Amino acid sequence: MSFFLGQILEKMGSIDKDIRFMATHDLANELEKDTFKMDPTYENKIVTKLLALTADSANNVQENVVKCLGLLIKRVKDSQATEIIDTLSKNILEESNKEELVEISGIGLKTIITNLPSEGSSISTLVIKNLVPKLLIGIDSEKLKDKNEIKMSCLDILNDLLQKYGSFMIGDLENIQKVVLPKLNATRPAIRKRAILCLANIAFPSPDNLFNSLLDYIIKSIEEAKKPDHISTLIQAIGAICKSSGYRLGKYLPKVMPHVLNYCDNNKFEQNDELRENCLLCFEAIIEKCQKDVTPYIGEIITLCTKYIKFDPNYSDDGEGEEDGDEEEEEMETSGDNDEEQEEEEEEEDLSDDDDISWKIRRSSCKTLCAIISTRPELLVELYQKVAPVLYNRFKEREENVRLDIFTTFVLLLKQLNKKLANPQAKEVLKQQVPKLVQSISKSLIDKSIRTRVGAIALLKELVMIIPGSLTGQVSQIVNGINLSLSEKNTNSNLKIEALVLLKLLLINEPAQSFQSHITSLSTHIVKCINDSYYRIASEALRVCQEFVIVFNKIRSSTDCKPIISNLFAANFVQLKAQDIDQEVKEAAISSIGTIITLFGNEIQSELQPCLSILLERLDNELTRVVTVKVLSRIINSSINIDLSSILPSAIKLLSTFLRKNNRVLKQSSLIALNDIVKVCPNLLPSSLLTGILTEMATLINESDLQITHLAFVFIQNLLKNYSEKHQAATLVNEKCIPPTLALLKSSLLQGVALESLLSLFATIVQLDEPGMKYEQLLTLLFNTAADIKQPVTRQSFHSISQCIAVITVNTTPALRKQTIHNLICNLSSVNEPLVLLSLSCLGEIGRRIDIHENENLQESVYKTFEANNEEIKQVAALCLGDIAVCSLQSYLPFILEQIKNQPKKQYLLLHTLRETIVKLSHTDEGIKTIHPFLQSILPLLFDNCVNEEEGTRNIVAECLGKLSMIEPNEIIPKLVEKIKSPSPLERSTIVTSIKFSIMENKEVVDQYLAPNISQFLSLLHDGDLIVRRSALLSLNYIAHNKPNLIRNDLSVYLPILYNNAKIKPELIREVDLGPFKHKVDDGIEIRKTAFECMYTLLDTSIDKIDVAPFIVSLCDGLKDTQYDIKLLCHLMIIRLANSNGAALLENITLLLEPLRVILMTKVNETAVKQQIERNEECIRSALRAVASISRIPNSDSIVKFEEFVKNTIRTTPLAAQFNSILSEDTMSNQDSMDTSN
């Protein structure tokens, strides 16, 4: 290294500039290597030489020198580093006449700052210490007061330092601020601009007192300012400070906003466009960063934006005043406009377009409106009423960039309607505006500018998707514009693609009749685009063709449609048979031609067979088989009855092989296609392939993919129903498919559509009565399968088998059915508990399907099992009796009600029975009709049991009341409301719980009868009894989760109640004397936990109605709670809030930092048991996830206190590794997936 450095030093002194260049270049390359080590003997010489070369006459040498100094600063001793800083600073401050040296020295210092480590280090501290005083001299020195270039260079360097090390420069910030603030008055705009950037970077890390003094100075300056340039600079400074410091500016808005609003619309300065633009940009920053505090001013800002988005004094549109009916606009259109540096001219004198900067004002208005649209979902209806018309009337904007911004703003407004909590009224307002909107945008569809057309199409695409079916009357206008884009020669490819996508969306979403007059022109353009050489245009055109054919099929009349279809088919066929085309085109061609064959196959008979042959080839191709299978299904199901005999046997053979492929989509599609074949054309299924198909089908019957299993069962059922050789099919099904089916019945995972299709299959099998699968044989197999289930057996173990037994029994002959029921009844007296459980389950499943009350000893035998020793048997017996009553209500319900009255020991089980009956009957109109006459007998009994001491019993009663209340709401809901005033807290608790079970019933009934009374039920949130209050909180949480619209408009009432219940109440903490020691019992834990669960739910369903500030105050209470569960719940709420309304969370983040710090620093006692240690570790991990979610919020790094919290509490502690691991996780892994709906 010494030899190398010696050579480099020698070459750097060469008189040949090329040698000097190569020497500095080689040195820079070496310095970039991690292995480079500076030789102490050469260090001083190298530094000295490099500093001397900053004045080199060759620019490329200077550039290399700057690079070397930036890399060298970290590798030299402090004394040499100081020399580098001092020399470069001296070049700037003392060599002011040498402009090139000043410039290169400034670049050198900026390069050094860039190369310094980001974290505070000794070298960084040294550079800051040496450089800041010199920069301040350069900015403020009297000697350099006329040297603007030096001031700008120093401000640039200082800004870089503040940006990178602001939080490490706290001690210097006050001096820097004192020096930089006066530069806001500088005569040169470039100096003012750099001063603003510096002040914004000072504001970010500055302590509160310094930040306050900065804002006080600026506000006072605005109040005293007279010149528009000075005012404009101060307002620009406020905007910049707001962007860097966010919510900290919020408390100053009452002092700031009146001035900004005034100057934005002040007639005195109406000729100063820059001032107006800066006001609007300031609004944008404030709206984004101070969402809560800016609320009182939003209305005025909207008014100003809608006014100045039309501000175009150099251009007069005579029709605009009439169209908008806006007098203000007419005034603005006749006003004059002055450049900022010119003297004030006469008002009537217009400027040339070259001097016109009014477009900046219109563009700034767009940006501010975008900020409002993005951050104020609660104003969506108002925005559509007030802003949308202004926007679409400005689609004629003459400046293209502004016009595109207006399009973007309107698209953003449209996208708000897709948000979960968007007010549906806004969509209705938009629908009324569609005619004018489309009329305005249609002009842009035929604009000469490609960018304008693409922007207009993007807007229309969004509109079609937001309000599908609402553009019926405007389709012609849009289609005319699409036709123009598709027909023009040399049209931009992107424009064609976008036009095709829009056409596809229109065809999918708008009524077919809307396209009646455009069929011929559209078909011509589609064919042309299908033949386009660019694969993206061709593939999109094929997708459009598919939708076009569907629309054409709906509106074709007796007129000859063959020419159009033939042309489309021919274009599709060319792409279908082509071998050397893109995969995207291949798939689109297969899908499109499949649709043509499906709907118009009779019109192209002569071309059909060659096409089907190619489709068979595509089916055998690994790349195209999935889409071809789907197309084959469509063709099979065609109403035209396409002759597929030439390809179907080969296709079936291929489909059967696909069933074993490790491709779920292919497997699923193949099963659907095989199903379609056995339904539509079973005779084309060769018997020779049946064994292979059913062998493959048997492998699909398992618990690993129940959707595939469901399709397999459906295929087997359709095969047995439709195949001509039923005996052969039944024999193979029995041999291949019944064994895996019986094995699946042992799985507790079998449920949903797979179970339903299996039950349907068993019903079909029994009705066929084929040898080997007769009723008695199936029954034996099912009972044997049940016997094979491992102990211990529960009712869930027999859930599927009992339903299968019930289905085959219901579908067999009456004689066999009666015998089976008799045997099941006899089994109830067995000592074999699993057999008793299975028999009870079977009787219940049979009884809820058909009336079996006439079977001897049924009621007595089932009721006797209520006395069994096994609790599981008693529970199943209760459900069995309830199920039997479903179809035998007249016979069984009076008995059940009588026993509830007279058998207190069996009352709990009998109430389960009653609930089972009510639940099953309330799901169908017929069931409701059946139970209605018994309401007068049931209700008194339920009301009597509302005061039962057992909470489980009261919950059953509440469910019954809730279900019944929706059967006869007129009568029952008033009775429930009356019971709210009951003196019994247990009865009040039961009544408020009942509404949980009401709200999931018929929506119309809930809205008509329950909604008007919901506030009366929830008045029990104020109840003095803890049990009642918790029941009310649980009901509120359930409503918030499932029917939030019932309470959304009253959250201002319910949220304070939740916040109050979330606090630790000393009066609910009691001391229990346990002899040797005393123990504190907190009776309010469950209340608090339920309140927080409800708050968590509301964050998901009603966040737009929540004022975040008091919500966070309550969150702080939760973070300080003594219960781990509540702390974990609060962490989840922070995560959910960070994801859904991060800006509002940041405005109040400082409240959360101390409680989070306490949690993260918590250590368990040395005597703590393992469970306590694990719970504390879990709580810390959860808190770290919450902090990580906050750190992911955009601009969270601008919150100084949060950054300091992360640094001091996490980054510099043993928690750092764990926190970094959480940060590196995918954001989705931190989703708050907890379900708190009770």
UniProtKB/Swiss-Prot annotation:
InterPro entries: ARM-like, ARM-type_fold, CAND1/CAND2, TATA-bd_TIP120, TOG. Keywords: Nucleus, Repeat, Ubl conjugation pathway. SMART domains: TOG. GO terms for biological process: protein ubiquitination; SCF complex assembly. Transmembrane segments: none annotated. It comes from the Eukaryota. Pfam families: TIP120. PANTHER family: TIP120 (PTHR12696). This is Cullin-associated NEDD8-dissociated protein 1. The gene is cand1.
